[in-house]
A protein has these predicted regions:
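Extended, low-hydrophobicity, polar/charged segments
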Residues: 2-189
Length: 189
């Protein structure tokens, strides 16, 4: 448990039109360093950007930086006991090894395994492989473990094709990072 001197609470919640304002918390604790503060600021600016574009989310909270779905699962269970019926999204960026060199952002339930051979057939593409760290940084301004649907904002040339698992559309809430893997956002599909 955090003591008061270690806590700094930033309360914010964007609500849908005509709904009552309800608070949600982003807790800044003693694990938050200067670099993290800058990333948190960027994520909060991104949340403001979403509001300006009338894209609303339900909750957003800070947690230690995570580099994958398995690592993040325990934080969601701990911090989100009050939230029901959410799906943590797995975000994978792959590209064709040969041919047209198409690039894809694959979004599915974090509990699912993605079979690249089967996906290749579904997408009628050549052999698929994960994109390099360098290309990920150049294309989507991110790094492995920090990929989110929101990184498509950096794909100005629209090189990345978005592939979303249809089952996600039946979830009440989807969980994505708001451009920083130390925060998570719950948003309706």
């Amino acid at each position: 448990m955090l003591n008061e001197s270690d806590q700094k609470i930033v309360q914010y919640r964007i609500t849908r039109k005509y709904e009552e304002m309800v608070n949600s918390h982003v807790i800044m604790d003693n694990t938050t360093n200067k670099s993290s503060w800058e990333k948190i600021k960027k994520a909060q600016l991104f949340c403001d950007f979403l509001e300006q574009k009338n894209i609303f989310y339900e909750y957003c909270f800070k947690h230690p930086e995570v580099l994958g779905c398995d690592e993040s699962k325990s934080y969601y269970q701990r911090f989100c006991s009050y939230v029901e019926n959410y799906t943590i999204c797995k975000n994978l960026v792959v590209h064709e090894r040969k041919g047209k060199h198409r690039k894809f952002l694959i979004i599915t339930d974090q509990s699912k395994q993605v079979d690249l051979k089967k996906l290749k057939e579904v997408l009628a593409s050549s052999k698929l492989e994960f994109i390099s760290e360098e290309e990920l940084a150049t294309l989507l301004n991110t790094y492995p473990g920090n990929v989110s649907i929101f990184n498509l904002l950096y794909d100005r040339d629209q090189q990345v094709e978005l592939i979303i698992d249809e089952e996600l559309l039946t979830s009440e809430l989807l969980v994505f990072h708001p451009l920083y893997n130390g925060m998570s956002m719950f948003i309706k599909p």
